[in-house]
Design a protein with these regions (language model features):
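Bacterial N-terminal signal peptides that target proteins for export
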Residues: 1-12
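Subset of outer-membrane beta-barrel
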Residues: 25-353
Length: 353
């Protein structure tokens, strides 16, 4: 009992420290480089796009929480592909290395390309096509403190270009994780993407902050059943997640459409917009199935008369020989969703013994 109290006290100290770090970065929920909030690997996409606590053999897990690095991920590498909405395509490469039993390093490179876009001048006349893309490098260090605690720090240079315009920014992540392997219990806290854009697309634009976010999550596996559940609270730094849209009287646009009082979000609805629920079905060591529900995604992408499976996501992973293959599909809107594919392996598994 004494050990449990010490662990809880230690985690609260770390949590308050991270929250204080995040609180200096105002303008919650806004900011530039919004692609940094996207799930760039299949495991994360299958768990609803938001998770900072799940412990697995997936090397990509430290992307959302640098404290999820561990010695078990030593020399693992992964490549991911994302087919996003509106013909946008992206990907991520990940690598981790354990310096020793206490110190771990990780690296992510991610990009999002938006294809060829139609160009127009200020008068609406068509010009040449142009391209746009976003890139980020995520450099991660984590240290095991003992008593089941790990803390981590990530630095991420960001580059973005639209046509002939470009910008550069620098962001940081800070995370903490408490993990009891014998309980299959994990608690994670992550302050993500706090930082600034230093060079602008054009001179008069001004400096803007990155889309910072504080997330906290709990993951617990059942002792006598192959299920592991996760609950993630998204945007601890911002209660109001009300993406407002006009209520349409019909499917046609009208100048008379206005927002109505019934669009006000009730307390319970707002609370659930912060929560992402996920479950993993662990079938042996070589296969798993994931499913999640993201209520905010369900509400924001819904049509007035149709929501369907909006907000649900599904994923599966299979180990074949020395490779792990994961795939996920996330439903965003009635007309479509996203597909993510990840392939990972351990470099050590190919070394001759």
């Amino acid at each position: 009992m004494c050990m449990i109290r010490v662990c809880i006290k230690s985690f609260l100290i770390v949590a308050l420290t991270l929250l204080s770090i995040g609180s200096v970065n105002a303008n919650a929920g806004g900011g530039v480089y919004r692609f940094l909030n996207l799930p760039f690997n299949a495991k994360l996409a299958g768990l609803g796009g938001e998770n900072v606590s799940v412990q697995s053999d997936d090397v990509n897990q430290f992307y959302t929480n640098p404290a999820l690095l561990s010695s078990s991920l030593n020399s693992k590498i992964s490549l991911s592909y994302v087919n996003y909405l509106a013909d946008a395509n992206g990907g991520m490469a990940s690598y981790s290395y354990a310096l020793d039993s206490l110190n771990y390093f990780g690296f992510n490179f991610l990009f999002m390309g938006y294809g060829d876009l139609d160009g127009y001048d200020r008068y609406g006349n068509e010009t040449e096509e142009f391209s746009a893309g976003d890139f980020a490098w995520n450099l991660v260090y984590a240290r095991y403190l003992g008593a089941n605690f790990t803390v981590g720090l990530a630095m991420k240079p960001v580059y973005s270009h639209i046509e002939s315009y470009s910008s550069f920014g620098l962001g940081f992540d800070v995370g903490a994780n408490y993990y009891r392997k014998d309980w299959d219990f994990s608690v994670g806290l992550s302050v993500r993407n706090f930082g600034f854009r230093f060079t602008d697309y054009y001179d008069e634009q001004g400096t803007e902050r990155l889309p910072w976010n504080i997330q906290m999550g709990i993951t617990k596996g059942l002792e006598h059943a192959p299920f592991r559940f996760s609950v993630t609270y998204d945007h601890l730094n911002d209660w109001s997640l009300d993406y407002k849209r006009p209520e349409k009287s019909n499917s046609l646009l009208s100048l008379e459409d206005t927002e109505k009082d019934q669009n006000e979000i009730k307390f319970a609805d707002m609370l659930f917009r912060h929560l992402v629920f996920g479950v993993e079905v662990l079938i042996g060591k070589n296969f798993h199935f994931d499913m999640a529900y993201n209520h905010r995604r369900n509400r924001e992408y819904a049509l007035s008369q149709a929501r369907g499976m909006n907000g649900f996501s599904f994923g599966a992973g299979l180990k074949v020989y020395k490779f792990n293959l994961d795939a996920a599909y996330a439903k965003y809107a009635p007309s479509g969703g996203t597909f993510t594919l990840s392939l990972s392996s351990s470099i050590d598994s190919f070394k001759k013994k």
